[in-house]
Amino acid sequence: MEPKWWPNQPVLEVKIEGNITDREQAFGITKQMVDDIESSKYSHVIVILDLTALGQSPSGAALLAGNLPQTYKIEHLVMINAPGLFKVATMPLFHLRNKLHYVGSQSEANKKANDLLPKLRN
């Protein structure tokens, strides 16, 4: 996982690399992401989650979505190349309903985040 904050903006980009084979590994990745968010100075954030590398592993994407620790700081979650199984696995995340955005490229994700920034509650 490669987390990177946008300079002076409440936007965290996270690129998932490699394979996810079990719940513990998935939870470890998402916990690190949530810990970065919780320790930030921002009340609410936009997360750009690049799942391109998991395209070959829909079960890994589902494990990742199903093991996302709860945080109320994620205002919008923009996912790049999310497999269909990931979309199904995020359905129980009621606190993110209408805040999940699916895009096909980094440029689309950047545009979406820039469009959402003025609406962010901070």
Question: Residue spans of the language-model regions?
Answer:
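Amphipathic, Lys/Arg-enriched alpha-helical "gate/interface" segment within cytosolic domains
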Residues: 1-122
